[in-house]
A protein has these predicted regions:
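A short, hydrophobic C-terminal helix/tail in secreted or cell-surface proteins
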Residues: 354-373
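Asparagine-centered strand-capping/turn motif at beta-strand->loop junctions
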Residues: 69-72, 86-90, 94-103, 260-268
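Cysteine-clustered segments with highest specificity for TGF-beta superfamily mature ligands
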Residues: 139-205
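A short beta-strand-loop element at or near the start of a globular domain
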Residues: 37-94, 302
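Beta-sandwich strand segments
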Residues: 121, 190-212, 328-340
Length: 381
């Protein structure tokens, strides 16, 4: 089980300042069974003497065991472990072409082998085990159970898939990935007595038992729920607004607050704010929000402020666009991107008219006064 930890500092994370947070993945396990697979490898030697066939490797066929892949529409894959628990059997038969009579008609054989089950670069391998057998005289011509020796083991274990290979196990929607099985380092030796024409060693390696239900393959997927950035703590709200109303020019800074929540819980991915863009870049508007990496865990809220400095008369508008991505460990598969939009507006007025406005007002007052005087003197206006 992975824990994705970070230190939450500052006063932004509501109720969690100065604490260590961790996103805890959810684990889902896929299981399957398969029929047994068998491979047969035959080595031979002509004439008296010893032959050793070292380090040969034969792949079992068919080799593929399908199992459900991780569906990236359900979350972010952050880890995986493969497990296997199956019986494996090595059977070795000695046989040969020998004369129908005479002495020294013996074939001695031996074989050492191991088996491997692999998934996405991770593998579990059995310990090597060996068997020996021989045939004598006419029994070499028609092999029987008396010329065959078997040894059984259990191939069992679990191992983690490298983060670099997680993408091999994931895809959008249902699908399958495959376990592979193989035989490794089959070291075989044949020793022929002097009256042997050709000696043979038949190595039979079986992965799994006759009962498919006992041949168990599984993969555990560790994943995080997607993050959910929102302007609300109760539901996903991706657009919001701040309205400063009408402010007096040079009347001093005005401040409004807003918050961003990562709706979720300890099983949710954190959020990284990768960039901030603005529609107008109006210099009268500023905010204390800045980009961050893994700065908002699931279920937490960050508080921010927007400041309006009314320096110029007229309407002020800007749209702040916040671009987020899921935060997850390197190699994770399925992270998403998100966007929040904050519309900010306000208006600035000046109660003292501009000089040009004063001129028109004075001209207007003068005209009104002149008309009034003419009327008082009995002259038409």
């Amino acid at each position: 089980m992975y824990k994705i930890a970070k230190f939450v500092s500052g006063m932004a994370a509501v109720g969690m300042a100065g604490s260590v947070m961790a996103a805890t993945p959810i684990t889902i396990t896929q299981n399957t069974t398969a029929s047994q697979f068998t491979t047969i490898q035959t080595q031979s030697r002509n004439g008296v003497g010893t032959s050793t066939f070292a380090g040969t490797s034969t792949v079992v066929g068919p080799t593929l065991v399908p199992i459900s892949r991780f569906d990236t529409t359900t979350g972010i894959l952050v880890g995986a472990r493969m497990s296997v628990n199956i019986p494996i059997t090595l059977a070795l038969t000695a046989r040969g072409n020998v004369p129908t009579s005479g002495n020294n008609r013996r074939v001695n054989v031996g074989s050492t082998v191991s088996g491997t089950v692999a998934l996405a670069g991770a593998s579990v391998t059995s310990t090597s085990f060996a068997v020996t057998e021989r045939c004598d005289n006419d029994a070499c011509l028609v092999p029987t159970a008396g010329n065959t020796t078997s040894s059984a083991r259990t191939l069992s274990g679990s191992t983690a898939v490298s983060a670099a290979n997680l993408a091999l196990l994931a895809g959008a929607g249902p699908g399958t990935v495959n376990f592979t099985t193989s035989v490794n380092a089959t070291n075989t030796q044949i020793v022929n007595r002097s009256n042997v024409i050709t000696g043979f060693a038949d190595t039979r390696f079986t992965v799994g038992g006759t009962t498919a239900a006992n041949n168990q393959y599984s993969v555990a997927y560790d994943y995080l729920n997607f993050a959910s950035p929102s302007f609300s703590t109760g539901s996903t709200v991706t657009s919001s607004s701040l309205n400063f109303g009408t402010l007096l020019i040079n009347g001093g800074l005005a401040t409004l607050n807003f918050s961003i929540t990562n709706i979720g819980n300890i099983n949710s991915a954190g959020l990284s704010l990768t960039s901030i863009s603005r529609s107008t870049n109006n210099s009268q508007l500023t905010s204390n929000i800045t980009t961050f990496s893994n700065g908002l865990d699931g279920g937490l809220t960050n508080n921010y402020s927007m400041t309006f400095d009314p320096l110029a008369v007229g309407a002020v508008n800007d749209i702040f666009t916040f671009n987020f991505i899921d935060f997850a460990p390197a190699g994770s598969v399925g992270a998403r991107s998100y966007q929040l939009n904050l519309a900010v507006s306000g208006n600035v007025f000046d109660p003292v008219p501009e000089p040009a406005s004063w001129m028109f007002m004075l001209l207007g007052f003068g005209l009104v006064g002149a008309v009034a005087r003419r009327r008082a003197a009995g002259q038409p206006g």
